[in-house]
Amino acid sequence: MAPEPEDIKDEKNPRPLDEDDIALLKTYGLGPYSTHIKKAEKEVKDLAKKVNDLCGIKESDTGLAAPSQWDLVSDKQMMQEEQPLQVARCTKIINPNSEDAKYVINVKQIAKFVVGLGDKVSPTDIEEGMRVGVDRNKYQIQIPLPPKIDPSVTMMTVEEKPDVTYNDVGGCKEQIEKMREVVELPMLHPEKFVKLGIDPPKGVLCYGPPGTGKTLLARAVANRTDACFIRVIGSELVQKYVGEGARMVRELFQMARSKKACIVFFDEVDAIGGARFDDGVGGDNEVQRTMLEIVNQLDGFDARGNIKVLMATNRPDTLDPALLRPGRLDRKVEFGLPDLESRTQIFKIHTRTMNCERDIRFELLARLCPNSTGADIRSVCTEAGMYAIRARRKTVTEKDFLDAVNKVIKGYQKFSATPKYMVYN
């Protein structure tokens, strides 16, 4: 048998590039436009520095402007003119809708006073029971204040829209349609419900095994609508002191009513929405009070307005029947395990941003992942990328995906809780 040539041996056993080879490529492998690009980048940097110098912006430890731009005299005068105000509560209005109207205010831990209005406040701005700012000399009302809401409740508002869209949620076509009918349609086309003379559904319960896309779909809903989105994790409402959880729920819905349109999303609602029982000790009484406050806010004496409530759980069997009745949660959406077509679609979604070979058979990979959730498939794609990084390649091959399927789907089978949760759902 003739010995193999050297070049064929080198092709069979490729040697990975070391640091010296990479440095050599960086030095001699520059393109024809690299010098022009570097020159343009340097010019942009110099111009940005020049603009900052003209604006008076300098890198400083304190982050203040240059001392030459300080105006201490006007700052001191402004501080003397704007006196700090004291927070009080207007308890009663005497002679309302008249010129000599007076206001009874209660300053905490001091006393009650009958005062008038400041020059900058209109009588229509002040209502009984609201918080106001009063000056420290005559206790005149200077500004109306918004209702007091716990900072921990305010922090639940999602300010930035999530970057997840409906196209990123694979295998949930039916669930997306049901969710859009409840959330988007009443907000965008309320006249359709008025013509029919029906009230739109008010709430949705999403249930299913972990990793099937419940929270992901809620994030897509938040991206789609212009409504304020408030995300509450069930365990956040379980507090140490009696009545704290119920107070947070009241303030949460009070904040939601102040918005033009609002979506409240309770994630892992089984932490507070469990069925009521008496354990003889009273350890769960506070959790049950919090749940009853949610029930009352969902369908109580006060109208809910344009507030939609979404809830997600892995254990719908543990929830209290009072929480699940129609009128509170009108629609129950099941998130099951994705079928073959859905798994193929999920593979394509997760590999959309990856550098993969073109001839990868995603349907074959989907067939090799039976009874797997969307989270499992995402883990497979991540693991395939790790195999490519380990081999110092810039693209992911089909063999990487097959190895990842063996590792994640077959190897991690003992950690999977999907069969266990399928019993509950």
From Swiss-Prot:
The keyword Protein biosynthesis does not apply. Pfam families: AAA (PF00004), AAA_lid_3 (PF17862), PRS7_OB (PF21236). It is found in: Cytoplasm; Nucleus. Its main location: cytoplasm. One of its GO terms (cellular component) is proteasome complex. CDD domains: RecA-like_PAN_like (cd19502). ATP binds at G208, P209, P210, G211, T212, G213, K214, T215. One of its GO terms (molecular function) is ATP binding. It comes from the Eukaryota. SMART domains: AAA (SM00382). Keywords: ATP-binding, Cytoplasm, Nucleotide-binding, Nucleus, Proteasome. InterPro entries: 26S_Proteasome_ATPase, AAA+_ATPase, AAA_lid_3, ATPase_AAA_core, ATPase_AAA_CS, NA-bd_OB-fold, P-loop_NTPase, PRS7-like_OB. The keyword Cell division does not apply. The 26S proteasome is involved in the ATP-dependent degradation of ubiquitinated proteins. The regulatory (or ATPase) complex confers ATP dependency and substrate specificity to the 26S complex. Belongs to the AAA ATPase family. This is 26S proteasome regulatory subunit 7.
